[in-house]
Design a protein with these regions (language model features):
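Zinc-dependent deaminase catalytic domain
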Residues: 1-142
C-alpha cells in the first residue's frame, strides 16, 4: 500500500459530479497503478455507462434509476481503451478514495456490482480503499 497513490485518488475525487440517488452526493476518486506508476484516474459521474448497466444486476438495483458511472467502472473503461488486450490486469492495483465534507475519511469500498466486475471481468487482484478508520487493502483469490 502506498499512501501517495491515495493522494492522487483524493484529487480525482474532487472531479466527481455524481449527485447520487436519494439526494446523497458521493464523490469517489480512483487511480489505477501498474508497475508502480499511475496509468489512469477516474471518478464517479452522473453520466450513464453500458458497463455499469451490465454489472448492476449483481446488487440491488432499481431499473427505473439510470446506470450512473461508478469510479471503478470508469477507470476500467479507460484502461481497456488505453491498453486494449495488452494489459495484465492481475498486476493492476486500484486505489479508491472518499471523504466526508469535513475532510475525514469515508468508506469507499466498491459495491457488489463493481467488486464482481473487477474480479470476474478484469481479473484485478488487489484494491485499496478508504474507511473512516483509515486505509484498507483487499486481495482477491483466484
Amino acid at each position: 500500500m502506498n499512501e501517495r497513490f491515495f493522494k492522487f485518488a483524493r484529487e480525482a475525487s474532487k472531479k466527481a459530479d455524481y449527485t447520487g440517488g436519494r439526494n446523497n452526493p458521493v464523490a469517489i476518486g480512483a487511480v489505477a497503478v501498474y508497475k508502480k506508476s499511475i496509468v489512469a484516474e477516474a471518478w464517479n459521474t452522473d453520466k450513464t455507462s453500458p458497463l455499469q448497466a451490465k454489472y448492476n444486476k449483481y446488487r440491488y438495483h432499481n431499473p427505473a434509476l439510470k446506470d450512473k458511472n461508478h469510479a471503478e467502472t470508469a477507470i476500467c473503461s479507460k484502461l481497456r481503451w488505453k491498453f486494449g488486450d495488452s494489459l495484465d490486469w492481475s498486476k493492476v492495483d486500484i486505489y479508491l478514495y472518499r471523504e466526508y465534507k469535513d475532510g475525514s475519511l469515508a468508506m469507499s469500498r466498491p459495491c457488489k456490482s463493481c467488486l464482481h466486475m473487477l474480479r470476474e471481468e478484469f481479473g484485478v487482484k488487489r484494491i485499496f480503499y478508504t474507511t473512516p478508520e483509515g486505509y484498507v487493502e483487499e486481495r482477491f483469490k483466484d
